[in-house]
Design a protein with these regions (language model features):
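N-terminal (or domain-start) structured segment
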Residues: 28-121, 157-160, 166, 182-207, ...
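An extracytoplasmic/periplasmic, membrane-proximal ligand-sensing/linker region
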Residues: 30, 36-38, 179-180, 220-221, ...
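Stable alpha-helical elements in mature extracytoplasmic
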Residues: 50, 54, 58, 83, ...
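Short, low-complexity disordered leader/linker segments with a strong preference
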Residues: 1-36, 330
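Hinge/capping helix and adjacent helix->loop/strand transition within the periplasmic-binding protein
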Residues: 89-95, 102, 110-195, 244-249, ...
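A ligand-binding cleft/hinge motif common to bilobed small-molecule-binding domains
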Residues: 104-114, 176-180, 207-241
Length: 330
């Protein structure tokens, strides 16, 4: 199994590297006049939420810096696959970009049998925009007070967990927990985050992994109880809440959400570099960091090669979990 994962890892890295290295003289000519028309950033979800907020703050600031229109277009549907596929099929000229979350870049290829795009062959990395922490929560009135207690309870009782849909980080986080702790959890998928969180709040569902900015207000007023942060270290926003690693004795546990900007494959390298340079600078602006803080997001702004490595690692990690835990779309 190790050799097959290594082989897959190598193929992903090679494809990403080839995509990034497809550079020639025309690329520099494109860079000199880029942008000369409206840039579209496609968000594969409905307006509102972290992905939309990230795209809009980047679009607004790019437009200001370049004195050229940059618009956000929301194309929801099929767990984000419709919007991302539309960009994968667009002209590779730098004028159509995609806001791509971890699920669409590194998870869905292992979950969907007929995915309408290949994130490695059909898309080129630009930069990772931000990372968002997830937190494991139960209802405030639940008699489960700790992750250790939840794990013990799951050995004799049916524990349910809600998600915004199959393949979401809430789904994978719960399955990673179940797989690591040797327990069974019952998946109850919803059509979106709001209803998934609502039924944990009212006690219909036992638990969920929620993005920190969505859960924090309810944790603060006692309507939710935080059992563990799904990141390698504790969150500065909830410093008293242990990590899942600490609370559940699960070494290496991590289920972090991230959002990246990607372009169609074969987009000139000089344009990719120009976009990355500008966006990395934008992510350091105080006003932009304030917007990200409000979303519970930590800015990144890494290079295309570094983003390719992140996609590479997460693809290998999540595909292994999906295979080992026999995770399927429901």
């Amino acid at each position: 199994m190790k050799s097959s994962v290594s082989a897959a890892f190598g193929k992903v890295l090679l494809a990403a590297t080839l995509a990034l290295c497809a550079i020639g003289k025309p690329a520099f000519a494109e860079d000199a006049k880029y942008p000369s028309q409206t840039i579209r950033i496609v968000v594969p979800f409905a307006a509102g939420g972290t992905a939309d907020a990230l795209a809009r703050v980047v679009a607004e600031n790019l437009a200001q810096r370049w004195s050229s229109p940059v618009i956000v277009e929301n194309k929801p549907g099929a767990a984000g696959n419709i919007g991302v596929a539309s960009v994968a099929k667009a002209a590779p000229d730098g004028y159509t970009l995609a806001l791509v979350p971890v699920g669409n870049a590194a998870v869905n290829p292992s979950l969907f049998k007929d995915l309408p795009y290949d994130p490695i062959k059909d898309l080129t990395p630009i930069t990772e925009l931000a990372v968002v922490e997830n937190v494991l929560v139960v209802g405030g009135n639940s008699n489960i007070k700790s992750l250790a207690q939840l794990i013990e309870r799951a050995k004799t009782t049916n524990i349910t967990y809600s998600t915004p849909g199959a393949g979401s980080m809430a789904h994978l986080g719960a399955e990673l927990l179940a797989h690591g702790a040797g327990i069974s959890l019952t998946h109850v998928p919803y059509r979106g985050l709001a209803p998934a969180l609502t039924d944990v709040l009212n006690g219909e569902i036992t638990m969920t992994f929620a993005q920190l900015p969505n859960a924090k207000p309810f944790i603060a007023d006692g309507r939710l109880r935080a059992l563990g942060i799904a990141s390698p270290k504790r969150s500065s926003a909830l410093p008293d809440v242990p990590t899942v690693v600490e609370a559940g004795n699960l070494p290496g546990f991590e289920a972090t959400s991230w959002y990246a900007l990607m372009a169609p494959a074969h987009t000139p390298d000089a344009i990719i570099r120009k976009l990355q340079h500008e966006i990395a600078a934008i992510l350091q602006l105080p006003a932009v960091r304030d917007v990200l803080d409000a979303q519970g997001a930590t800015p990144v702004g890494n290079t295309p090669e570094e983003l390719a490595h992140v996609i590479n690692e997460d693809t290998a990690r999540w595909s292994k979990l999906i295979r080992d835990a026999h995770i399927e779309l429901q």
